[in-house]
Structure formats: structure tokens, C-alpha cells
Regions:
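Short, contiguous, well-structured surface segments enriched in hydrophobic/aromatic residues
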Residues: 246-251, 255-258
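C-terminal accessory/interaction regions of large nucleic acid-associated machines
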Residues: 69-221, 230, 239-248
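Polybasic, proline/glycine-rich intrinsically disordered low-complexity segments
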Residues: 261-268, 301-303
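Compact mixed alphabeta submodule
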Residues: 287-313
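Short, hydrophobic/proline-enriched secondary-structure or compact coil segments at domain edges
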Residues: 217-232, 278-283
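Long, largely alpha-helical accessory region at the distal end of helicase-like NTP-driven motors
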Residues: 2-104
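Charged, low-complexity helical/coil segments in non-catalytic cytosolic or luminal regions
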Residues: 223-225, 241, 264-266
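Short coil-to-beta transition motif at edge beta-strands of beta-rich domains
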Residues: 265-287
Length: 313
């Protein structure tokens, strides 16, 4: 057991020079072509370990196995893969990005449905991580395709991630269209785009750290839930007590200022009467073992059963 743990530790703490050396030596170990998938498989290295250091293409260039390539969009695409897509787990979303990547991101917005346009905006935020900066969403997506080496890398990464998914996504019925699926995992930014809180012109003010986000136009509130909370990430007043009681029952503690006799507290109690949708997005904890921010699993729609207390409820 100790040996296995030591091997895992060694594999996850490789430095850049060790990775580069392994890339150089790959051809001496096997007759397989050097691809990201073959490399991580042969060396028992996680894809996260690669992206803690650099993009796969840049590591290969530093190892002298591919020619140097232009740096256009490199920082943004490296960040999108390492910080966004490795925190996401969704067959439908990954397949959508894969499809446009295979067209070199050379898209025309008029070819897409409303739901697909929402996913294009999710991709925009994954890569550029901000609103605007382009005349249009179409131009923003087209720009991603300018670096051919990294487009090839995006395709390779997405195929690996799709292959790793071991669960079935399920559609959720809501009174409006949105592209997210039950059981899949998404970043906070992707969720805020899907529920129309972040637009092309303006990023939601809820993009950082608050446990709830509401869109009154579609009468929907999102609960962002961390099951394990560390005192580093939470103040004593926000260490809310959230946990599953059973497969169908969940204990959730509201924000501190929420009263049970007015305002938001009453909308929770009366949400069915008000036609308000309360959607649960849950993650184990804020970061994983690679210190990457975890995405949230779309658990589904919540239905109020009972409450006790006030401020918080």
C-alpha cells in the first residue's frame, strides 16, 4: 500500500524538467506515436499533472519533439483546459466544443440553435474569462481557432475527457431552455451563463464565491453547495451546514441574513406557489487534490419540505 501511495505521489509531483525528459524518452520506450493519450497512459500520469505545468504542445516543443509554434491565444487556451475543462464533466458540452474545434472554431452564429448559442457563450467565458472584448460572439469563437497547434491539442484533450466519463447525463424539464444536464459537472461561470445571469456584454456579479444566484426573469434560483467546507475558504458565519439526509432529501442552510417571515425566506417556503425553480449544484469541496477549483454536479430541482430557525433558516 505504501509503495502504491509513494508511486502516486511521485507521479503527481513531477516537475517540468522531469516531464520534458519523459517526453524525450517516449520514443525509446514504445513504438506507439507520441500523443497526449499515449503519453499519460504509458507513464501512468494524470492529465491534471500535465496541465499543472504547461500545455502539452509547449512541453513537446521544449522537449524538442515538435517545432516551435506561435503564442497567439496560448495563455488563454492553456488556462481554459487546465482551469475550466478539467473541472467540467459533461458529455454533451464536451461533444459540442469538439464539434466546433473540428471546424477550427470557424463558425457562423446563424447556424446554431438558442441552446447552442448559450454553449458558445459558455466557451467564450471558458477561454476569455470575461465579457465583451470582441464585436460579437461569433468573432470571439473564431479567434480561438487562430492557433492551429492548440486547436489540435483541444481536440485531443476533449477526446480523452469524453472517453473518461462513466455516467449518463439526463435532461431536466424546466419552463425554459438551457443546455445543462443532470449528473454532469460544470464550473460556476458555465452555470451563470446557462441560466442567463452572465451575458456576452456583462459577466454576472455572482461569478465569485456567493452561495446563491437568482435570475428573477426566469424565476430561478441556483444554490451552489460545498459539502466539505474548510475554515480557510469560509468565515465562521458562512460555514453553513449542508448535507444529504437520503437520496432524495437534502439539508441546506440559508444565508445568514435570510429570515423565515419575509423576503427571500418566504420565497423558499412558497416557491411552488410562486412557480419559482430552485436548482441544486453540489460539489465535494472547493478544490481537488491538484489544487484546481472543483466544478459543481447538477443534482436537480429542489422542492421545499420543511424548515426551522431564522437568520439562517
Amino acid at each position: 500500500k505504501e509503495t502504491i501511495l509513494e508511486n502516486i505521489k511521485r507521479a503527481t509531483t513531477l516537475n517540468v524538467n522531469q516531464l520534458i525528459s519523459k517526453i524525450r524518452n517516449f520514443q525509446h520506450q514504445t513504438t506507439l506515436p507520441l500523443t497526449l493519450e499515449n503519453f499519460i497512459s504509458l507513464n501512468h500520469i494524470s492529465i491534471e499533472t500535465i496541465y499543472k505545468k504547461d500545455s502539452w504542445s509547449r512541453l513537446c516543443q521544449k522537449a524538442g519533439v515538435i517545432d516551435d509554434f506561435e503564442q497567439i491565444n496560448e495563455k488563454q487556451i492553456y488556462s481554459a483546459i487546465g482551469k475550466k475543462w478539467l473541472s467540467t464533466n459533461s458529455t454533451s458540452y464536451f461533444n459540442f466544443i469538439l464539434q466546433i474545434a473540428k471546424q477550427n472554431f470557424n463558425i457562423r452564429i446563424s447556424d446554431f440553435s438558442e441552446n447552442e448559442k448559450t454553449m458558445l457563450l459558455m466557451v467564450h467565458y471558458d477561454v476569455w474569462q470575461n465579457a465583451g472584448d470582441f464585436d460579437s460572439l461569433e468573432k470571439s469563437i473564431n479567434q480561438i481557432g487562430k492557433n492551429k497547434t492548440l486547436v489540435k491539442e483541444i481536440i485531443e484533450v476533449l477526446e480523452i475527457l469524453i472517453d473518461k466519463i462513466g455516467f449518463k447525463e439526463i435532461d431536466i424539464e424546466l419552463p425554459y431552455e438551457q443546455p445543462l444536464k443532470l449528473h454532469a459537472r460544470y464550473t460556476r461561470d458555465q452555470i451563470l451563463v446557462a441560466f442567463r445571469m452572465s451575458t456576452f456584454e456583462k459577466r454576472s456579479s455572482n461569478a465569485i464565491g456567493v452561495g446563491v444566484a437568482e435570475n428573477k426573469e426566469i424565476n430561478t434560483e441556483i444554490l451552489f453547495i460545498d459539502l466539505i467546507k474548510s475554515e480557510e475558504d469560509y468565515s465562521p458565519t458562512t460555514l453553513y451546514d449542508d448535507y444529504a439526509i437520503s437520496e432524495t432529501l437534502f439539508h441546506w442552510q440559508s444565508q445568514n441574513q435570510t429570515r423565515d417571515d419575509s423576503g427571500k425566506g418566504l420565497t423558499y417556503i412558497n416557491h411552488k406557489k410562486l412557480g419559482k425553480k430552485i436548482l441544486l449544484f453540489v460539489r465535494e469541496q472547493s478544490t481537488n487534490e491538484f489544487k484546481n477549483t472543483n466544478g459543481y454536479v447538477f443534482v436537480g430541482e429542489g422542492n421545499f419540505q420543511e424548515h426551522e430557525g431564522s437568520k439562517p433558516m
